[in-house]
Curated annotation (Swiss-Prot):
Protein name: Apolipoprotein E
Name of the gene encoding the protein in the UniProt record: APOE
A GO cellular component annotation in the UniProt record: extracellular matrix
Gene Ontology MF: a single term: phosphatidylcholine-sterol O-acyltransferase activator activity
Sites where the protein binds heparin: L161, R162, K163, R164, R228, Q229, K230, L231, H232, G233, R234, L235
Length: 316
C-alpha cells in the first residue's frame, strides 16, 4: 500500500515538474524507462498501470500520509521567502537614507512606491507558499479524483506566480533606474539654481567695485576685488561640493542596483538547487516502486492462474 501511495505522489510531482520545466525552458530529460505507449513518459506509464489497481483500494493509512506529505517543502520555502523579504527591506531603508537630501515630496513619493513594490513581492511569495500548502492538502485527499486536473491546475498556478514574480522584479529594476535618473537630475538642477541665485550678487559686487574704484580709489578697489574673488571661490566650492555629492549618490545607487541583481541571482540559484533536491528525493522512490511493481505484477499474474476472479484489464 505504501508503494502505491509513493507512486501516486511521485507521478503528480513529476507531472507538475514537466509543465514547469517546459515554462522555464529546461531541456534536462527524465530518466529513461520502457515505454507504455510510443510517446509516454515513465511517470505516465506508472500512473496508467496504477489506476487499474487503485480501483480495488478503498482505504489508506494515516501514517503513510504523514510520512510522505510532510511540511519540509513549505518550511524551506518559508525560510527562503523570509530571507528575500529581509534583503528587500534592508535595501529600501538604505535607498531612503540616500535620498534624504532630496525634497520632502520626492522622498515621500519614492518611499511610498518602494513600500508598494515590497508589499507586492511579499504578497506574491506568500501566495506561492499558500498554493503549495493547498496543493499538499489536495494531494492528501486526492484518492478518487482526477490526477490530470489537479496536476494541470497546479502547473497553471505556478506559471502565473512565476510571471508575477518576474514582473515585480522588472518593475523594481525600472523604478531604480527612474530614481537614479531623478536624483541626478535633481542634484544638477540644485547646482544650477544656486549658481543662478549667486550670479546677480557677483554682478552687483562687480558693479559696486567699479563705482568704488572711481570714487574712492585703488585701496577700495582692491578690497572689492578680494571680496569678489572670495565670493566667486565660495560659489565654485559650493558647485564642487554639490558635484561630489552627486557622484557619491550615483555610486551608491549603482552599488544598490548591483546588490539587487546579485540577490536575484542567488534566489534563482537557490530555486534551481531546491528543484534538484526535490528530484533527488523522488527518483529513488520511482525506481524502488518500479521494482516492487514488477514483483506485484508477477504475483497478480500467478494469482490469476490460481483464482477464477481476475482484475480489470489495462485500457491504455
Amino acid at each position: 500500500m505504501k508503494v502505491l501511495w509513493v507512486a501516486l505522489v511521485v507521478a503528480l510531482l513529476a507531472g507538475c515538474q514537466a509543465d514547469m520545466e517546459g515554462e522555464l525552458g529546461s531541456e534536462e530529460p527524465l530518466p529513461p524507462e520502457q515505454p507504455r505507449g510510443q510517446d509516454s513518459q515513465p511517470w505516465e506509464q506508472v500512473l496508467g498501470r496504477l489506476w487499474d489497481y487503485l480501483r480495488w483500494v478503498q482505504t489508506l493509512s494515516d501514517q503513510v500520509q504523514e510520512e510522505l506529505l510532510n511540511t519540509q517543502v513549505i518550511q524551506e520555502l518559508t525560510v527562503l521567502m523570509e530571507e528575500t523579504m529581509k534583503e528587500v527591506k534592508a535595501y529600501r531603508e538604505e535607498l531612503e537614507g540616500q535620498l534624504a537630501p532630496m525634497a520632502q515630496e520626492t522622498q515621500a513619493r519614492v518611499s511610498k512606491e518602494l513600500q508598494a513594490a515590497q508589499a507586492r513581492l511579499g504578497s506574491d511569495m506568500e501566495d506561492l507558499r499558500n498554493r503549495l500548502a493547498q496543493y499538499r492538502s489536495e494531494v492528501q485527499a486526492m484518492l478518487g479524483q482526477s490526477t490530470e486536473e489537479l496536476r494541470a491546475r497546479m502547473a497553471s498556478h505556478l506559471r502565473k506566480l512565476r510571471k508575477r514574480l518576474l514582473r515585480d522584479a522588472d518593475d523594481l529594476k525600472k523604478r531604480l533606474a527612474v530614481y537614479q535618473a531623478g536624483a541626478s537630475e535633481g542634484a544638477e538642477r540644485s547646482v544650477s539654481a544656486i549658481r543662478e541665485r549667486l550670479r546677480p550678487l557677483v554682478e552687483q559686487s562687480q558693479s559696486r567695485a567699479a563705482t568704488l574704484s572711481t570714487q574712492v580709489g585703488q585701496p577700495l578697489l582692491d578690497r572689492a576685488e578680494a571680496w569678489r574673488q572670495k565670493l566667486h571661490g565660495r560659489l565654485e566650492e559650493v558647485g564642487v561640493r554639490a558635484q561630489d555629492r552627486l557622484d557619491k549618490m550615483r555610486q551608491q545607487l549603482e552599488e544598490v542596483r548591483s546588490k539587487v541583481e546579485e540577490q536575484g541571482s542567488q534566489i534563482r540559484l537557490q530555486a534551481e538547487a531546491f528543484q534538484a533536491r526535490l528530484r533527488s528525493w523522488f527518483e529513488p522512490l520511482v525506481e524502488d516502486m518500479q521494482r516492487q511493481w514488477a514483483g506485484l505484477v508477477e504475483k497478480v499474474q500467478l494469482a490469476l492462474h490460481l483464482s477464477p476472479t481476475s482484475p480489470p484489464s489495462e485500457n491504455h
